[in-house]
Regions:
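Rossmann-fold NAD(P)H-dependent dehydrogenase/reductase core
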Residues: 1-222, 299-306
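Pocket-edge positions in alpha/beta enzyme catalytic cores
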Residues: 35, 64, 235, 282-285
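Short coil/turn segments at secondary-structure junctions
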Residues: 106, 110, 167-171, 231-234, ...
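C-terminal helical subdomain
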Residues: 176, 227-278, 285-291, 295
Length: 306
């Protein structure tokens, strides 16, 4: 990974898992890393751990709840008020397959509302800081959006994006991850059309052995069973540190391309420490559907850009 001194990098969901390991690696390379966390206590624990593992690094904790558009707006306003550049935005945070349908503070299904709408709003509101970075640096700013191999089974149900008619935990998750990937691709197209130097890149971690696996809202019994399964199949899955590699590649590699999608190159893209171009399902390349999704995101969030 290239040296990152002087770059300000914001990572959502950075208090644990892939987000934490990405923050750790970037901090060790000299970046100024902002850990965006919903829970202050968990964020402070993560920040203390990071300072222990990487002393004398430049990190800060910011409170941001992607399941609340008012929280997103408040954070973005505070950040823009500091008049400082943002060189890399990593849209990492995610909710995975809660067994019962839940809603965000704004009434959206929690996976679509957090994974797609929250990051859409955050990206749009922080665009001035990314453009400021472009004006002050010779390097192009980057927006990295985390998708998933689960997008391959995803379908955008525009008649029921909020899963109010029928809720399936995994179908809602797959839809949200397809939405993330389509957002990243559509964002790239719009940035290019606007002749913007900002890059939009997607990545996925493979299947990490803590890939929201035990952190989702399941009963103690379900978590116990999932824990046993996770231990049994660890050999086939990525660690969180390995899972962070595609994110780091997208955020820092000189040959990462805007509009690209990167993931591990091991069996079925499930694991591996080699990163390369990831497989894209045909539905993720549907430009008409992506444009429609963009309009829906604008309408639901009230955030309009590009």
């Amino acid at each position: 990974m290239p040296w990152q001194a002087g770059k300000r990098i914001l990572i959502t969901g950075a208090n644990s898992g892939i987000g934490y390991h990405a923050a750790l690696k970037l901090a060790r390379k000299g970046a100024i890393v902002m850990l965006a966390c919903r829970d202050r206590k968990k964020g402070e624990i993560a920040l203390d751990r990071l300072h222990t593992e990487a002393p004398s690094t430049h990190t800060e904790l910011v409170i941001l709840d992607l399941a609340s558009l008012s929280s997103v707006r408040e954070f973005a306003a505070q950040e823009l008020g500091k008049n400082r550049p943002l060189h890399v935005l990593i849209n990492n945070a995610g909710v995975m397959a809660p067994p019962r349908r839940q809603q965000t503070a704004d009434g959206f299904e929690v996976q679509f509302g957090t994974n797609v709408l929250g990051h859409f709003a955050l990206t749009g509101l922080l665009m001035p800081a990314l453009e400021r970075a472009a004006a002050e640096s010779t390097e192009r700013p980057r927006i990295v959006t985390l998708a998933s191999v689960a997008h391959k089974r995803g379908r955008l149900n525009f008649d029921d994006l909020q899963s109010t008619k029928s809720y399936s935990p995994m179908k809602a998750y797959q839809q949200s991850k397809l939405g993330d990937l389509m957002f990243a691709f559509e964002l790239d197209r719009r940035l290019r059309a606007a002749s913007s130097p900002v890059m939009s890149i997607a990545a996925h971690p493979g299947v990490a052995n803590t890939n929201l696996f035990l952190r989702s809202d399941h009963s103690a019994a379900q978590k116990a069973v999932r824990g046993l399964v996770a231990h049994a199949i660890d050999m086939f899955l990525n660690t969180d540190a390995e899972g962070a590699l595609p994110t780091l590649y997208a955020a820092t590699a000189a040959d990462a391309e805007s509009g690209g999608y990167y993931g591990p190159q091991g069996f079925q893209e499930m694991r591996g420490d080699e990163v390369g171009a990831a497989q894209v399902a045909p539905q993720a390349r549907d430009e008409a559907a992506a444009a429609r999704l963009w309009r829906v995101c604008e309408e639901l969030t009230g955030v309009r850009f590009l």
